[in-house]
Curated annotation (Swiss-Prot):
Record's bilayer topology term: Peripheral membrane protein
PANTHER family with a match to the protein in the record: AUXIN-RESPONSIVE FAMILY PROTEIN, AUXIN-RESPONSIVE PROTEIN SAUR61-RELATED
The keyword Ligase appears for this protein: no
Nucleotidyltransferase recorded as keyword: no
Tissue: Expressed in stamen filaments and petals.
GO cellular component, one term: pollen tube
Membrane spanning stretches: none
Entry similarity comment: Belongs to the ARG7 family.
InterPro entries, sorted: SAUR_fam
Subcellular location: Cell membrane
GO biological process, one term: auxin polar transport
This protein's name: Auxin-responsive protein SAUR62
Other notes: Plants over-expressing SAUR62 display twisted inflorescence stems, and increased length of stamen filaments and petals.
Amino acid sequence: MMINAKKLMKLAKKWQQRAALKRKRISFQRSSITTSSQTAVEKGCFVVYTADKIRFSFPLSYLSNTIVQELLKISEEEFGLPTEGPITLPFDSAFLEYLINLIQRRMDEDTEKALLLSISSARSSFQPQQHCSATQQLLVF
């Protein structure tokens, strides 16, 4: 499943506008990915929270990654588009850190496809009380 550049830019702009409604100040980007409890969003970044309430800040360039697109789609299906709160992913912080590591290693196309299939299968078997077992079934690279 690929998303064309025009639709991706439209999606990114929609998320930026929603995020802009909530932020009060913008600071300059110091690192590519951070986890913290601060409320301001660095310029050129977007923020997501995990199911265990950990905050992650990503550069906007990550929006073009198919894995990140799939995570945002899962979030939208699970929680809807946030109007009064942050974007929340239905995964814990350890799983998201694992995905970030794989994205930063610039995996090949076959590995990316396998990971997307794993995320989809984990999502289809996702139950709130089975959350840990669903994420443990993912492929490890």
